[in-house]
Amino acid sequence: DKLETLHDGPNSLDSRAEIAAMKGDYEMALKYQLKAFDYATSSSPYQYNLPVYWRKGNQSDVSNGLIEAQKNMQNAILEGNVEDFSKYISNDFSLVTGDSNLGDFYNFSTENIAQDRNYNWNSFALRDFETHFSPDMRTAILTFYASGSYTFTDSSEEVAYSTRASSVWIATDQGWKCAHANWAP
């Protein structure tokens, strides 16, 4: 390649990565970006696109991982498992939630899990997921449906539950973290 003979350094490799990404060849983009990063691994400007190219090349796996994270986070909430729930939220930003009862949006935290409830879930299932990524692959929106039933503890009345839902996940240095969830009627 003429570019490589003129200049064989990190800028050249970074440019090759960008060109490969523009062509949709994220495997090649990742390969060149890793080579550029090898020149300067500490505070390297070449590090920024590494996760982008990896996520683009592994979009299906990333999507499946996010869907699994959503299910695991929901199970942790239902089971009152603060430790597991904490894996999916960030210390740097809140998880803002809107419930299907149409109340105000609020910050959902480990404190919410410990609250007493006047109902118990009989069943709760998530299904029909779709994953939508931002162009830089650093934000994902999951859309899905939830169904099940719960019983009020004071009256033993069973209520069927069905709603559509969405969540916003942000890629952080500690992994994907949920920033927003909406449970719409």
Region annotations inferred by a language model:
Residues 3-7, 40:
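Alpha-helical junction/boundary sensor with strong preference for TPR arrays
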